[in-house]
Regions:
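Non-heme di-metal
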Residues: 1-205
């Protein structure tokens, strides 16, 4: 078997079939941001949620936009490291979900509410905890190729430190008697499904 970093010129000769199986599993559960009618949550945002709740949700969703774009870039870089068609396909499929689906889903509510992206960016820099998370994200992804084995754990670190803790915050709007932003949380559930699947796929390597 060719080493994982050695180019396999024979498309269709799958030396890492688990990568192809993962790619197909992700495609089987693929979805789009257009499918989630977050505009149905507009009343909750504008009339039910408190101003602090809404601001926290706005900045969290925009933080997720930044994270998803960075994570997508990470997976595209992984694809270039392992030149086997099945691995490239799997990594590219994850990157597509991150950059073309997840990021645009998180941005969708800001678009519905006509929130100025520059205003959100300013808020992210004035809220210390968000500024620190964005700084950590930049540090983790700044020089992936310097240590490839360590970098394979990069996405897991981003998911655990930056994403899942904030997923819990958003999910709290559907707990303890609350039933707010239902459509938004449906999309969050889809993202979590993709995240768990990518964890399984990454561990297979």
């Amino acid at each position: 078997m060719l080493p994982i970093e050695t180019h396999n010129p024979l498309f269709g000769k799958y030396l890492y079939p688990q990568a192809k199986a993962f790619m197909e599993s992700q495609q089987d559960v693929s979805w789009s941001a257009q499918e989630i009618p977050v505009e149905d949550d507009k009343h909750d945002y504008l009339s039910v949620m408190s101003i602090p709740q809404r601001r926290l949700t706005d900045t969290t969703l925009q933080l997720f936009v930044e994270i998803e774009q960075r994570v997508g870039e990470v997976w595209n870089e992984f694809a270039s490291w392992f030149p086997h068609s099945e691995i490239e396909g799997a990594c590219t499929e994850i990157a597509r979900m991150e950059k073309s689906v997840h990021a645009f889903f998180y941005q969708k509510m800001s678009d519905v509410l006509n929130i100025d992206p520059s205003t959100v960016a300013e808020n992210q820099q004035t809220i210390a905890v968000l500024r620190e998370k964005l700084g950590l994200l930049g540090q983790i992804t700044s020089n992936l190729s310097a240590n490839k084995p360590l970098s394979l754990f990069t996405v897991a670190a981003i998911e655990q430190v930056l994403l899942f803790s904030n997923f819990a915050m958003l999910k709290s709007f559907k707990a303890k008697g609350h039933n707010l932003i239902k459509k938004t949380l449906t999309g969050v559930d889809y993202v979590i499904q993709d995240r768990l699947l990518s964890c399984v796929g990454r561990n297979a390597y």
